[in-house]
Amino acid sequence: MKKYLKTDEWNIIEDSFQADRMRWSESIFSLGNGRFGQRGHFEEPYSSDSYRGAFVAGITFLDKTRVGWWKNGFPQFYTRIPNAPDWSSISLRLIDEELDLAQWDVDSFNRRLDMKAGISYRDAEVTSPRGNKLRLHVEHIANMAHPNLCLIKYSVTSVNYTGKVSLVPILDGDTANPVRHPDEKIWNILRSGTTSDCAYLWTQTRREDAQICYAMTYRFFKNNKETFANPIRIEKEKQAGFSVGTEVKPGDTVTLVKYIAIASSLYYERQDLIEASVAEARNAQSTGWDALEQEHRNAWQEIWDETGVSIEGDPEAQQGIRYNIFQLYQTYRGDDPRLNIGPKGFTGEKYGGNTYWNTELCCVPFFLLSTPKKIAENLLIYRYKQLPKAIENARKLGFDHGAALFPQVTSNGEECHSEWEITFEEVHRNNMIVYAILQHATLTGTLEYIAHYGLEVMIAVSRFWSQRVSFSQPKQKYVILGVTGPDEYENNVNNNWYTNYSCMRCLETTLSFLEIIARQYPDEYARICSITNLNYTEESERWRDIIERMYLPEDPERGIFIQNDGYMDKVLQSTDAIPAGERPINQYWSWDRILRSCYIKQSDVLLGLYLYYFNFDRETIRRNFEFYEPMTVHESSLSPHIHSILAARIGKVEKAYQLFLHATRLDLDDYNNEGDQGLHITSMPGSWLAVVRGFAGLQIQGGTLKIEPVIPAKWSGYSFKVNYLGNTLHIQVGKEIKISLTAGKQLNIQVYQNVYELKQGLDLTVNRKDLS
């Protein structure tokens, strides 16, 4: 499915109608604004293969755990994001005919997603079975300035038809979850109805009792003049709306503007949902499309001004990186610490809409570096608020004394994963949360978050590791047994190097910040010691002993770290040995065959070298990269950008570029042949990080911002903004490196080996070096 879409730096363009790509296209053209989102399905009914999906942030339902072999510690229930009632539905009816692109001839078709403006456009010329020709034009906005509003402008022009055209906007509560519950209805309709100008639909999930209410108003035009046709009210058990129509002749155009307000029990008292949604829908109708669209465009412009990356000479890369930033912001606004980012966002039900450690790996550093807003901090507060349940989760698995194991998958703090080799064994996820807290302190230069929240998390995670390690008498070292590392194609192994190493670094981080907070925030330190019942002398001694005597498997002859015990016993061969028709291997091979192979799903050892880069010299990184990357199939969306960053840092710029393209266009070119299920939202910031931390070589060392830029051969230059210690820098890389301080007073920056002082209004220009 590669290269189906047209290349355009600001637009995603589909210029033909291909029914066999429908579900994938629906994923690609998804829209959202962080409060709600919807797959890019047609507004009108479509009788062939389609996945109509709508999702509302923070609204979940309890689903019973389904496993073949129950094990102690599995969750009884877990939360999932439900496919919400459909707010976008608009039917188009002629005399005795209804538009259905699966049944009508599609004479021309063009769909465009304008990423700069955040607007989806669809144009088509269609012919009905009776020979009636129409032209369609549809615009769709998930309003970024008004997070409860969705706007749809639906226009139809008669080419050869004479007669009545009716447009039927409805709110449809008759939906199911097609991925997991195709035959079960998740929603109960509490109330639905219409007034003279408004329709509403009030619903509740069958389990967990979350509620949402939609309200809809509309305006109707004929040849650009508003027409007050007598609407027919539609009031059914699970639907509410109107049918509005008028007589047309060839050349006439009728337009319906649908204003939808979406209110949920996350933000409103339940008894106020109808009133709140109706008031907002009516206010939107009064404000009008043009003003609401402009406010929406302005909101997107603010995002692009902060986070935009400009790439010169490579439209495919430019399109891809903008698409990834666009979809991330469509999923997460960053203004509510009760919310997080699901791997599929609002583009599909897979993974239940829950949170993984992907957030801390990719999203937190992106938001820390790309915007001065406290978006990343809200993601960290989300984890802090779930600390009590993480402690309870660890207790269920036999840990005590306030040890915490954060869930592999969650939306409410409770574990929502039920594969034992992941749920119980992929425990390295704990370290990623501590690492993200460290990144926050490093990049903001502030300690308030750690003093008020983060240190409690660090203590609880360190207590987990204190109990999870074992002491090997033969080795006289601490070992960690029965784990799954980041490479999920290796399960239940001993001494995964990344897990062991990141455990050490986690304990070191906790000890370091205990000392810092004790000095700088003595009152907070005393409070934390009290509520955690910390025995500093005893516990710190234990943690230091683990750090000093942790076993780290390595191969001295090759000069590499060994991924885990037993890995070197495998037949070691590159991915070139895999037949082309058997990729991705997780779609063609048995699990037994995958486990016995040497093939690596995603960065494992190399992830540790990326996160703790300054602890290793360049040659060590190069040796490990050259050993492990050829055996990596990159079948996790988290993999390509990590490898791209490391490749750029060790001078393999063109290899870095190929991996960057993989990360950047993973969904647009459907690398993993699974785009029909939704997008890979939480790995999308990786493409931005690959530019900033990879090609630009941005790192923080000893409190100094450092860059070592390189440029792929295809590019003539690139530029981006970055935030550090409350300062905003604009960095341009071409034949020269130009750096300006656009916000802030003064900052030192190291470019290659030299340190320069930046001041606002005084740009810095440095010659770029060849580091290959």
Name each model-derived stretch:
Residues 76-129, 134-135, 618-622, 629, ...:
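Non-catalytic C-terminal accessory modules of carbohydrate-active enzymes
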Residues 323-330, 382-389, 456-468, 505, ...:
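Alpha-helical scaffold segments in carbohydrate-active enzymes
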